A protein has these predicted regions:
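YjeF_N-associated NAD(P)HX repair module
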Residues: 1-15, 106-109
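Glycine-rich phosphate/diphosphate-binding loop of Rossmann-like nucleotide-binding domains
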Residues: 8-77
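Glycine-rich phosphate/dinucleotide-binding loop and adjoining beta-alpha-beta core of small-molecule
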Residues: 48, 53-149
Length: 149
């Protein structure tokens, strides 16, 4: 620990989100995106190398991280990601929300594979949780925002 004590982020806890989230249409199909999670994993690696304890909340990705300073929580949906972020948000010094979270999910998820019975399929969608908006509602002060589009 005496070696880590000289690092700039030693003693800090950072929460980072990474990757996509997927929203099930039925047991074999989902709404998702092509986010790789690479940016979030690189941010986690960098923060850990600078001495931080990192909580990494990742959607489905092939990225891996090998660091005893990173605790990874694998999630699938926007709701699952929100739940883990909510659980840890009040205990961290900083949060970087870099995941590509789905904006919408099917209002109803079919319990079995949807069969091709007609020429078209109509899906009704509803908004997912806005993670940043929801954590701000907890009354936790968010002092600095950096939005990158």
């Amino acid at each position: 620990n005496h070696i880590l004590a000289g690092l700039p982020l030693y003693g800090k806890k950072i929460l980072i989100t990474a990757g996509p989230t997927y929203e099930a249409i039925d047991p074999v199909r989902f709404i998702g995106n092509y986010a790789s999670g690479k940016m979030g994993f690189e941010l986690a690696k960098s923060a850990a190398n600078k001495g931080a304890e990192v909580i990494l909340v990742s959607g489905p990705t092939h990225c891996k991280i090998d660091s005893n300073r990173v605790i990874t929580h694998a999630v699938f949906t926007a709701k699952e990601m929100y739940n883990v972020v909510h659980q840890h948000f009040s205990s961290v010094d900083a949060a970087i929300l870099s995941a590509a979270v789905a904006d919408y999910r099917p209002k109803k998820t079919a319990l079995s594979k949807i069969k091709k019975t007609s020429e078209s399929l109509l899906l009704e969608l509803e908004k997912t949780e806005d993670i940043l908006e929801k954590v701000q509602e907890l009354g936790i002060e968010v002092r600095h925002h950096l939005y990158i589009k």
